[in-house]
């Protein structure tokens, strides 16, 4: 038919621009049907440009294990701009079978550990592609915890692997083809990891146990060295259920006590969010108490679906998300703008009914990536 031009015949720059607007899953399809497109998508320049554009509009990522059928589900949405081809809500069911623990995503990738077999994989949630890592030996009484980081200077991802037995050495793997070995590294501060942490400016931060005391440990991904951080004055990390979250408003991360709810109800439906914020530049803690007007009125289902503070999205918005989905398989995220004192809701369908996906992890600043395509 006259007037119709095939995609293959379009100018290279136009094809490149169209591909840059596609979702990661759509790029996978393109790479399957066309060797020329696959070659373009896998170039370093395209990967860097695609990631750079995605970083301008980060996503909120939800990860869940199926409670009826054993598979991993990812859902993400983008709030900043109206959807292009790569924006909007993305729902992905992976082929990964089993019950997994999730570590926070870094530059479009996420690390998962299967509870029973201790299988470790690196996954791109947008493409469902994953890379299996070598098995780490551990007995039935030992839990494996992983953290994903990125060395910007060498342009490589690294996985820090720790086991809950203090006498076992810490391991590091530089991500490549999947055949790279785990390497034992020396730690001058023997500790066990308590839970997931955050990755910020080349450093992993996580809660750990050191001589029967809870501390905050750091791991420099480039130098592969550990260093503890002193907890805030008057804060006992052994008391309560503390969690680290990204907090970009003050150039670092925040420490919150989830066992106290950290939402303090006051008369009239207002509430206070209290956090300890670590500034990575000044290396100092500061107490942050934010008044949230009419929280009780806005979060009408707060009692049934307990909202937790998950960090900041952009400069001014605080993000609150429930730890489990509703019976219809959906969840509602609340965003509060500290500058305008305005609320927004975003309802996300997790593709499950009843209790199929009961608990969910929420991660901020996830980005689309072409890695593992």
Swiss-Prot record:
PROSITE patterns: FBOX. Residues 4-49 form the F-box domain. InterPro entries: F-box-assoc_dom_typ3, F-box-assoc_interact_dom, F-box-like_dom_sf, F-box_dom. This is Putative F-box protein At1g76830. It comes from Arabidopsis thaliana (Mouse-ear cress).
């Amino acid at each position: 038919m006259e007037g119709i031009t095939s995609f293959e015949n379009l100018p290279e720059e136009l094809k490149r621009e169209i591909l840059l607007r596609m979702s990661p899953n759509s790029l996978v399809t393109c790479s399957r049907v066309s060797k020329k497109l696959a070659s373009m998508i896998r170039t370093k320049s395209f990967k860097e440009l695609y990631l750079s554009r995605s970083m301008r509009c980060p996503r909120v990522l939800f990860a869940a294990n199926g409670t009826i059928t054993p598979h991993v589900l990812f859902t993400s949405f983008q709030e900043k701009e109206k959807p292009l081809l790569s924006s909007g809500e993305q729902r992905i069911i992976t082929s990964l079978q089993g019950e997994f623990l999730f570590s926070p995503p870094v530059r479009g990738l996420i690390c998962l550990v299967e509870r029973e077999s201790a299988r470790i994989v690196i996954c791109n949630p947008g493409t469902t592609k994953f890379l299996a890592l070598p098995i780490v030996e551990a007995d039935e009484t030992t839990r494996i915890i992983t953290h994903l980081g990125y060395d910007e200077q060498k342009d490589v991802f690294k996985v820090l692997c720790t086991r809950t037995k203090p006498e076992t050495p810490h391991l590091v793997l530089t991500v490549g083809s999947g055949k790279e070995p785990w390497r034992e590294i020396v730690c001058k501060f023997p500790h066990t990891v308590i839970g997931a942490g955050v990755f910020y400016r080349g450093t992993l931060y996580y809660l750990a146990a050191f001589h029967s005391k809870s501390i905050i440990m750091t791991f420099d991904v480039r130098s592969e060295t550990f260093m503890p951080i002193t907890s805030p004055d008057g804060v006992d990390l052994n008391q309560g259920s503390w969690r680290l979250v990204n907090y970009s408003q003050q150039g670092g991360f925040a420490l919150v006590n989830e066992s106290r709810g950290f939402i303090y109800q006051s008369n009239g439906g207002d509430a206070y969010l209290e956090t300890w914020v670590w500034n990575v530049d000044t290396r100092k803690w500061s107490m942050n108490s934010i008044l949230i007007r009419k929280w009780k009125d806005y979060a009408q289902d707060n009692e049934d679906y307990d909202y937790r503070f998950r960090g900041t999205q952009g400069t001014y918005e605080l993000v609150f998300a429930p730890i489990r989905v509703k019976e219809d398989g959906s969840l509602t995220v609340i965003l509060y703008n500290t500058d305008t004192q305005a609320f927004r809701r975003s309802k996300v369908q997790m593709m499950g009914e009843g209790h199929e996906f009961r608990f969910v992890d929420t991660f901020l600043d996830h980005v689309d990536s072409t890695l593992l395509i």
